[in-house]
Amino acid sequence: MKTITFILQMLFQAFSSILTFLFETISDAFNSNNKEYKADFAVPGILLSRFNYGFCLTGSKKLTCKDSYQNALIMGGTGVGKSSVVLFPSLYSMRGSFIVHDPSGELLLKSAGYLQQKGYEIKVLHFANPDISSRYNPVSRAKSSSDIQKLASMLVETALGGKSKDPFWNTQATSLLTILITILKTQEVEFQNLYNVRQLLNRMGGNPESVDALFSEYADNVLFSEYKSFIAYDEKVLSGIIATCKASLNLFGDESIARVTATDTIDFMEFRNKPTVLFIQNSVADQKYYSVLTSIFFEQFFSFLLGRFPKKEEKDIFLLIDEASSLNLPTLPLAVANVRKHRSGIMLLVQDFNQLVHHYGKNDADGIKSNCFAKMYFTGQSLETASELEKTLGKYEYKDKDGRKVVRSLMTNDEIRMMKINRALLICGHHPPIKARLNPYYKNVFYSGYSKLPVPKLQNKILIEHLFILPTEIFKKDSNKEEDGNA
């Protein structure tokens, strides 16, 4: 009996979809305008299909993978259906590997069971929960001096907001962190993490001679000279720089964060070699607290994506970044302009476009939007966005009941702002706009079933019971380092 009911539900859903498509096609045909002003909506079928495997933008219809490589920008306030219409259906229907920013944890709960059934390797990065989290160590991925400098810069700028009245402190803090991370890279791998950078800062404040000895023994001449020039600062200035550095690394006083970032178990190449999904989770309330590490992760993943071209047999990689405005991603403008060449696509979800303007400035925010092939606007847009959309959609003319020619906007800003909850505007590349009908996942027989599959048991395979702190003996070496060939 259950099987018969299930089959009937599927048939009804398919029949309903066909009727909806026919109705929209006929309606669009009758509403076409062949006048001087002839703005009109396109039929969704010109870009979207149930049989594609790219980003799902309506809950049922998807872009092609090729179009998805050109990115998508989803804009809508809380509760309008960004997750239920776009994120869940995309996870249920797309192919390839995923990096998913999942602040609420809901995406993992309702998709991991199905993805595991499909053969996906499920990973979680949760800085507050070491027992289930994969390990991620930003220092281990900083291979070159420029990588180290970028990491130090992100730690300072993201943690402190880059809003210091005097940029001297942030600049010098970045330089000192770069020097300390570089000296740590000369030590055993278990000591190469930001927890131990923080320990070095503590020693500089209380026992600077021990750090002098470390540099004397392990630094090359260039690094040793840079360190000496730093400690030559006036004591008050040096204390201020150290304090700025410690504020940047304040997170690493948290034992959970220190454990998760002490080593690294995430192999970026896995995402190319087999179907893999990583959910980056932190509670919504703590999102700002953890955003430094999440931002650094995405920056380092962008470097991986843009650093090589995938082989034919390797997997596509898609990044679904919910609450993108909570992150500081300096490379994002470059990434959205170039990931298509690397068989990858980025979906950004924000509440309002002005959030991107606030983070990246007007020029870069416009660049990000321009490099997103699909731009999706849910109901409830701000007046500024709605007015801009009214101009973008254009105008059309018609004759009123008295035969007079009337010109009006395809949609006024009020009509855009007050669209029905089950409608959204899609503007894709050079194509005419689409007024899409939305179908949340829970109204789809298949997707609703997928969401109820149990979450697989998550457990970190490498349990670190303690943190490896730099041993005291390395600070006790004889400290008269001679500089070769320097007059």
Predicted regions and their residues:
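Long, basic/Gly/Ser/Thr-rich N-terminal segments
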Residues: 1-29
